[in-house]
């Protein structure tokens, strides 16, 4: 994000006054140089890992280099914060939780994402948040293959592979894929 200098400035002002982990919630498509600026400021990274196949990334996100960029970014995040650590209260104190949202008709890409994460960083040190709440909005009608919610079969296929790979983390209930759980994104109140 282009706001990193302002984020660092704000964190400098509260350094030593906060007793909570600093969490960086990101879409994952980040420059390594930007992430290096955050070293020492962030305790927990929450990146998305959306696509394995760059053709899919190009089609839906106009990011034909998505896979290379996100892998480099998550690698840098892992270098900075290392393995997930929890306090005596059971809350995460540092580490990475990678989020992945399964898209309709793309379960094989989701499985490839999980296999890549397991291959590069293992399943012991990084947590996974496997999400099922995809709801077709915005321009999804331009892409018939994603203009519906994911099926139970699709999500369960990805969930099964996550379990086979040994991932720990949070596997979302498919029932969360309802409109009432999706923000309006209308910028009201901003």
Where are these regions (language model features)?
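C-terminal accessory region of radical SAM enzymes
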Residues: 83-85, 90-94, 153-177
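Short amphipathic alpha-helical segment that frequently serves as the phosphate-/nucleotide-binding helix
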Residues: 111-114, 152, 156
